[in-house]
From Swiss-Prot:
PTM comment: FMN binds covalently to cysteine after exposure to blue light and this bond is spontaneously broken in the dark.
Species annotation: Pseudomonas syringae pv. syringae (strain B728a)
Protein name: Blue-light-activated protein
NCBIfam families: PRK13557.1, sensory_box
Modified residues (S-4a-FMN cysteine): 70
Length: 534
């Protein structure tokens, strides 16, 4: 035993030229797996041995790397977090297994499955670090190709679903608008027929708007109006909704943690998310004996070791709400797809397939997660997690919105690159008593201000061509003409607008599409605000 210890100790000094009979180094040399040995007792933990497989994998000669630290394998795209985890493991003298992007001598990159382990002698002294490696580039490339294929499949499903739903809505809108146009040409107008057509066209617009918001929520682009609330209170306020959704034949049980912490989420989107969960649970209970729903809330602490068990939630404190049904459940083949957009097992017309994807997007954008547990024939649990908010829940009633007032001939400059959209906004604002003008780009708007035209409000689209978008225009107008109030509008995503240090929007925003009364109300709020922020 002492003879073996001497051989190992000698090798640890770096004098390995005469260690050919050493079983350890002979095994390392002859294996087909790339391996190196480093000496932690020397400065910078240099390589003291590299086998032939390692040299072939990296393209280096032995004399080029012996005595060097392994960092020469790193390159511009090497993950610095992975590098730091390796350094930490070496400092702590523990095993580590990771995958990292490394570089060969010729500059080409490869994915390296790396395993590092400390080696001790009989006296318990650290003498080596032993590192085995494997080029797994083909596997990683195959995984990336699979992910890309899955993305394309999902994109195809998404675009197909969008086209299907929007074509139906456009058919409704276009058809009823044509009917209104035909009615206007007749000598005697059937008022009831026109009113019915207007009602159906407006309903289609509202459904299209809801569909867009659900898509943006899935993509985590929809702006959420977060405020501090308690999930127990949310359950209480939605009790009538729950009862209407399930009916008297379904038993509803709750277990609400009385010490539940608060969270900051959008209450409207939260209610919509719960409604989608309830609807799916209701459909799963059809035909089941003793149908039952169980709603539970609880506090949760996620640490660094457990975060992957919660879909990568950041370590911290969370609250959760779970809805469990004893319905039909789902097979494993469906479980992993139920939160994909437009994926549905329901019949045509019974669901768009956006409900649970909207739930997923809402939870993610709120800093949380959505998880589903299901067993075919047994039931399903859908649980949402949200970060705890330490702010004190306000006991005051929410402030009421400003009362609607007709405009008093305030002058409004409309900046919109779509003439039809701009003309509609002008008609609406003029009908409400404002005096509005239209320009089609930001440069023209600035020219109006520079020429001495006076306006009380700048109403500008967010996304415009020409090198200056709505935010840039708004900032320039506010800088040069500080008395002018600003209101932005967008049909894309309010998350494109930068946030202030206090967490609010830099400018007030109204989303497209919006009803005329909503636009007029928002304009009134901004005009009444002290600095353009209601």
């Amino acid at each position: 035993m002492s003879e073996n210890k001497t051989r190992v100790d000698n090798a640890a000094t770096g004098d390995i030229k005469h260690q050919g009979k050493d079983i350890f180094f002979a095994a390392v040399e002859t294996t087909r797996m790339p391996m190196i040995v480093t000496d932690p007792n020397r400065p910078d933990n240099p390589i003291i041995f590299a086998n032939r497989a390692f040299l072939e994998m990296t393209g280096y000669a032995s004399e080029e790397i012996i005595g060097s630290n392994c960092r020469f394998l790193q390159g511009p795209d090497t993950d610095r977090t992975a590098v730091q985890s390796i350094r930490d493991a070496i400092d702590q003298r523990v095993d580590i297994s990771t995958e990292i992007l490394n570089y060969r001598k010729d500059g080409s990159s490869f994915w390296n499955a790396l395993f590092i382990s400390p080696v001790y002698n009989d006296a318990g002294e650290l003498i080596y670090f032993f590192a085995s490696q494997l080029d797994i580039s083909r596997r990683r490339d195959a995984e990336e190709a699979l992910r890309q294929a899955q993305k394309m499949e999902a994109l195809g499903q998404l675009t197909g679903g969008i086209a299907h739903d929007f074509n139906n809505l456009l058919q409704v809108m276009g058809g009823y608008i044509d009917l209104i146009g035909s009615a206007a040409e007749k000598p005697v107008i059937d008022v009831q027929r026109v009113q019915r057509s207007v009602h159906h066209a407006k309903s289609a617009v509202e459904r299209a708007s809801t569909l867009t918001k659900q898509l943006l929520a899935f993509a985590r682009k929809q702006k959420l109006q977060g405020r501090v609330l308690n999930l127990n209170g949310l359950v209480s306020t939605t009790e009538p909704l729950i009862e209407r959704t399930f009916g008297p034949e379904v038993i509803i049980e709750t277990d609400l943690d009385p010490a539940l912490k608060n969270c900051r989420i959008d209450p409207t989107q939260a209610e919509v998310a719960l409604l989608n969960i309830f609807i799916n649970a209701r459909d799963a209970l059809i035909g089941r004996l003793n149908p039952k729903i169980f709603i539970e809330t609880r506090n949760l602490v996620v640490d660094e070791l457990a975060n992957m068990s919660y879909d990568g939630l950041l370590p911290g404190r969370y609250v959760s709400i779970a809805v469990t049904d004893n319905g039909i459940g789902m097979p494993a083949s469906i479980r992993d797809r139920v939160m994909d957009p437009f994926f549905t097992t329901k019949e045509e017309g019974k669901g768009s397939g956006l409900g649970l994807s909207m739930v997923y997007g809402f939870a993610k954008q709120s800093g949380g997660a959505a998880r589903i547990y299901t067993e075919e024939g047994v039931g399903t649990t859908l649980r949402l997690y949200f970060p705890v908010d330490e702010a004190v829940l306000s006991k005051n009633d929410p402030p009421k919105a400003s009362e609607r007032r007709i405009g008093s001939s305030e002058r409004i400059l409309i900046v919109e690159d779509r003439p039809d959209v701009a003309e509609l906004a002008k008609m609406v604002l003029d009908d409400y008593g404002y005096v509005s003008e239209i320009v089609l780009n930001a440069r023209e708007a600035l020219k109006r201000f520079e020429a001495g035209a006076t306006y009380d409000l700048l109403f500008t689209d967010l996304i415009m061509p020409g090198g200056m978008n709505g935010v840039m225009l708004a900032r320039e107008v506010r800088r040069r003409f500080p008395k002018v109030k600003v209101l932005l509008t967008t049909g894309y995503a309010e998350s494109s607008i930068e946030r202030t240090d206090i967490g609010g929007s830099e400018f007030e925003v109204v989303s497209k599409p919006c009803m005329p009364q909503d636009l007029a109300r928002k304009v009134r709020q901004v005009l009444d605000g002290p600095n353009g922020i209601a």
